[in-house]
């Protein structure tokens, strides 16, 4: 028997206090505040952050009455930046707001006067969805573990078990996989990388010991670790200055962290700060729903789907499927199954996936496809 091929694959994730992630969360907090009062809000909200300053800018058309200052400060407080000693303070930071109405040229192209089903796509673009059978969540193990390491650090910071932790954290996980005719089978964890912002008083040696014991060993399945697993915990040594003080932040700069950790192609459009009329978000969620449904139905072990849209046109212009040789049917047959089971017009997706609700802030941390409670994570029963 020939030895099956193994390979290494890596994904990274970042914590809630990473400057780009702060911006994603602020943008989605504003979106949620709009949708809470007006489900038909049209929102394209960007955020930028640097030392002592948050700026929100973009186009919002809504009947909602918003206190932007309060929304921004509440979001930063929840993340955990409540003291300038941590590099950022929700109480004293400067909040700048430059929000205008949606362009009437864009609005007229979407045909709001028609029924919701015929709502045109809010822009052109390509979206990808991906699913794999290697984890119950249908996500690559690399990105799932990278997210879980950051989640565990946030929990340990909030419950006081690691009180020296600060909100800005980064993780990276390398898994050794076996390629089983296109299916990815995780064999072992090759490398774990963690960098965590910390209080000044803890030594690097103590920090490394505690992160290894209280984070790595609790999150990573023991049977995936071996004597050859490599650990790079706080490889830079000191990391006291973090968050927006250490680095500027922008909405939409962590789109690989938000999605599939590099295991799938990327459409290029970010998710956060956009309402459901923006297919960058709604159609990417739908593509995940389709991919996950195909794997759950046993039609394939791993799949990527691509959709494309044009502004003002409701129906997608194209569908593409790649099952990596893991499918029980041809790709053409699978495309027909998708067409038969899914209506991919944005105005239909908003109803089927219930997207006109204030549900988006939690998606802005630890990936948009990690929380299994979301509608797009629940596979549809397919007829074929």
UniProtKB/Swiss-Prot annotation:
Q: Which Gene3D superfamilies match?
A: 3.30.300.10
- Sequence positions that bind ATP: 18, 168-170, 236-239, 247, 253-254, 270, 274, 278
Q: Is rRNA-binding set as a keyword in this record?
A: no
Where along the chain is Mg(2+) bound?
12
**Reactions it catalyzes:** L-methionine + ATP + H2O = S-adenosyl-L-methionine + phosphate + diphosphate
Q: N-acetylserine occurs at which residues?
A: 2
Subunit-structure text: Heterotetramer.
This chain belongs to the protein called S-adenosylmethionine synthase 2
Q: Which gene encodes it?
A: SAM2
């Amino acid at each position: 028997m020939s030895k099956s091929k193994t390979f290494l694959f890596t994904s990274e994730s970042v914590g809630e206090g990473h400057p780009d992630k702060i911006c994603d969360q602020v943008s989605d907090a504003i979106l949620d505040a709009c949708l809470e009062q007006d489900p038909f809000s049209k929102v394209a909200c960007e955020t930028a952050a640097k030392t002592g300053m948050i700026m929100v800018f973009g186009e919002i058309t809504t009947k909602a009455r918003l206190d932007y200052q309060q929304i921004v400060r509440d979001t930063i407080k929840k993340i955990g930046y409540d003291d300038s000693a941590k590099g950022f303070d929700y109480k004293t930071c400067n909040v700048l707001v430059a929000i205008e109405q949606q362009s009437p040229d864009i609005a007229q192209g979407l045909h709001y006067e028609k029924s919701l089903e015929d709502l045109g796509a809010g822009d052109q673009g390509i979206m990808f969805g991906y699913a794999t059978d290697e984890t119950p969540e249908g996500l690559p193990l690399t990105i799932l573990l990278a997210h879980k390491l950051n989640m565990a650090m946030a929990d340990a910071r909030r419950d006081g078990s690691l009180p020296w932790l600060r909100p800005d954290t980064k993780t990276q996980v390398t898994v050794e996989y076996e390629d089983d005719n296109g299916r990815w089978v995780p064999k072992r964890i090759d490398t774990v990388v963690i960098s965590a912002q910390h209080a000044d008083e803890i030594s690097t040696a103590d920090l490394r010991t505690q992160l290894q014991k209280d984070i790595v060993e609790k999150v990573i399945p023991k049977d995936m670790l071996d004597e050859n697993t490599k650990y790079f915990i706080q490889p830079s040594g000191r990391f006291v200055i973090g968050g927006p003080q250490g680095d500027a932040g922008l909405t939409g700069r962590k789109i690989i962290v938000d999605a599939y950790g590099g295991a799938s192609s990327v459409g290029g459009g970010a998710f956060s700060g956009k309402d459901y009329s923006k297919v960058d978000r709604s159609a990417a969620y739908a593509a995940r729903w389709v991919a996950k449904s195909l794997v759950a139905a046993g039609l394939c072990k791993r799949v990527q789907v691509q959709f494309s849209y044009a502004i003002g046109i409701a129906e997608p212009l194209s569908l593409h499927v790649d099952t990596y040789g893991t499918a029980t049917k041809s790709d053409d047959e699978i495309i027909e199954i998708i067409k038969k089971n899914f209506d991919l017009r944005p105005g239909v997706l908003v109803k089927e996936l219930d997207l006109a609700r204030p549900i988006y802030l939690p998606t802005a941390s630890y990936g948009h496809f990690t929380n299994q409670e979301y509608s797009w994570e629940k596979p549809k029963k397919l007829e074929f």
